[in-house]
Regions:
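Single conserved hydrophobic/aromatic residue that forms the stacking wall/gate
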Residues: 162-170
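Short, glycine/acidic-enriched loop or turn micro-motifs at the edges of active sites
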Residues: 36, 146, 169
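Alpha-helix N-cap and loop-to-helix initiation/capping positions
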Residues: 74-85, 113-124, 152-160
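Conserved beta-strand edge residues that scaffold enzyme active sites
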Residues: 38-39, 63, 108-109, 147-148
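Generic enzyme active-site microenvironment
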Residues: 31, 141-142
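N-terminal pre-domain/capping segments
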Residues: 1-99, 127, 134
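Short, small-residue-enriched loops and turns at beta-alpha junctions
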Residues: 12-13, 109-111, 147-154
Length: 170
């Protein structure tokens, strides 16, 4: 039986974010996801989940400054420490909210950085995130995003995913 989660970043946008939890429950959803929880405390969000009988399904690792067009940090060699701090923050939220998966946005390929450096950074960051999340009982998930919706997005097709070294390879 398929299960659907309401994406509160995309649905019920006529309401304030915290009011969207009730709107999702009223529409019959049992689970929710959204881009980022970090503008609110985990306690505020947990209260909305509990009050509305909802399960937190997924959210993203911090992805840089979304308002300025950033769409992830995983492929940025000059932002590794920020990426790692984001993994720690996401785990702290997930431990309160109860979700068992977190999505990592690869990011827009940085200009002026060679392919090998970008790929090595990306794979090392994925390995770091996968190891930390697994230790916390959380699954790391990824999504490809086409370059029409996000020009320059690094992980933009499955061919790249299959030809890149696995984060689990030694």
């Amino acid at each position: 039986m398929p299960r659907f989660a309401a994406n509160l970043s995309m649905l019920f946008t006529e309401q304030d974010f915290l009011a969207r939890f009730k709107a999702a429950a009223d529409a019959g959803f049992q689970g929710v996801e959204y881009l980022f929880p970090y503008e609110f405390s985990s306690a505020e969000i947990k209260a909305q989940l509990d009050a509305n009988g909802l399960t937190q399904v997924l959210f993203n690792l911090p992805a840089g400054d979304w308002a300025k067009g950033e769409r992830g940090l995983a492929c940025h060699p000059d932002r590794v420490e920020e990426f790692r701090a984001g993994v720690k923050l996401a785990i702290a939220y997930a431990q309160v909210l109860g979700n068992t998966q977190i999505n990592c946005l690869a990011g827009i390929r940085p200009a002026g950085v060679d392919d090998e450096t970008v790929e090595k950074t990306f794979v090392a960051n994925l390995k770091y995130a996968a190891d930390k999340l697994q230790a916390a009982g959380i699954k790391l998930v990824m999504e490809m995003i086409n370059t029409r919706d996000i020009p320059g997005f690094y992980l933009n097709n499955t061919c790249l995913l299959y030809t890149s070294p696995s984060p689990r390879d030694p």
